[in-house]
């Protein structure tokens, strides 16, 4: 409701793995969702339709769910951002529970900035909603605070092995570019001791 109050327009509902239980996007009576990159690839799930609507640029953001990866997995497999906020920061009122201690709305967007902006708008501290934590502050969604804490370590370029899969290399490099565009610090590390194991 907070998103609609802020001017968001709901365009519809999307497909997902039945009962939101599946991590590949192929378990739906309404058809299989496939990757934005290739119809031969799975989309990831369970919130596959939510992820694909953003990845295909049909919408600028969408809302899904995430208990054990249902938001983050299809986001990763379709090269978009999948944000699972801290449990209790966004309301789960109206959710059919799968695991109440882990269930959470997820936000899909094309950038970290957009995902955090949506989470910031959707944030509520209503004392009437028993699914929310009251010790979490709206200011915690400030993107600069979050970016300052994120550092991603990756192997040196010569140590990255994609086993001849040019598409995998391209997707990996696209992800690194997208993270750097969002001012996320990428640190190159020597991965040789793991390669020798």
Please give the residue ranges for each predicted region.
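Residue-level recognition of alpha-helix initiation/capping sites
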Residues: 1, 44-45, 170-171
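Beta-strand segments within the central parallel beta-sheet cores of soluble alpha/beta enzyme folds
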Residues: 12-15, 65, 132-135, 189-190
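Acyltransferase
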Residues: 164-190
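Short, intrinsically disordered, charge-balanced linker/junction segments flanking boundaries
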Residues: 193-197
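General small-molecule cofactor/ligand-binding pocket signal
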Residues: 11, 153, 185-192
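A short helix-breaking turn/cap at a secondary-structure junction
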Residues: 84-173
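Conserved hydrophobic/aromatic pocket- or pore-lining residues that grip, position, or stack substrates
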Residues: 1-3, 179
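Short glycine/serine-rich loop segments
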Residues: 4-119
């Amino acid at each position: 409701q907070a998103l609609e109050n802020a001017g968001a327009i709901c365009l519809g509902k999307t497909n997902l793995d039945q009962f939101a239980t599946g991590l590949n996007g192929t378990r739906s009576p309404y058809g299989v969702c496939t990757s934005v990159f290739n119809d031969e690839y799975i989309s990831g799930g369970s919130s596959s339709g939510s992820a694909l609507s953003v990845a295909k640029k049909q919408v600028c953001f969408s809302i899904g769910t995430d208990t054990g990866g249902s938001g983050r997995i299809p986001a990763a497999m379709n090269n978009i951002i999948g944000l699972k906020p801290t449990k209790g920061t966004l309301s789960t009122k109206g959710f059919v529970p799968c695991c109440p201690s882990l269930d959470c709305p997820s936000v899909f967007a094309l950038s970290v900035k957009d995902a955090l902006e949506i989470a910031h708008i959707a944030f509520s501290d209503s004392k009437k909603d028993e699914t929310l934590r009251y010790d979490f502050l709206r200011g915690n969604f400030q993107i600069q605070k979050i970016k300052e804490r994120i550092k991603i370590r990756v192997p040196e370029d010569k140590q990255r092995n994609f086993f001849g899969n040019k598409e995998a290399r391209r997707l990996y490099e696209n992800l690194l570019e997208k993270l750097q565009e969002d001012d996320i610090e990428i640190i190159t590390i020597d991965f040789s001791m793991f390669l020798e194991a």
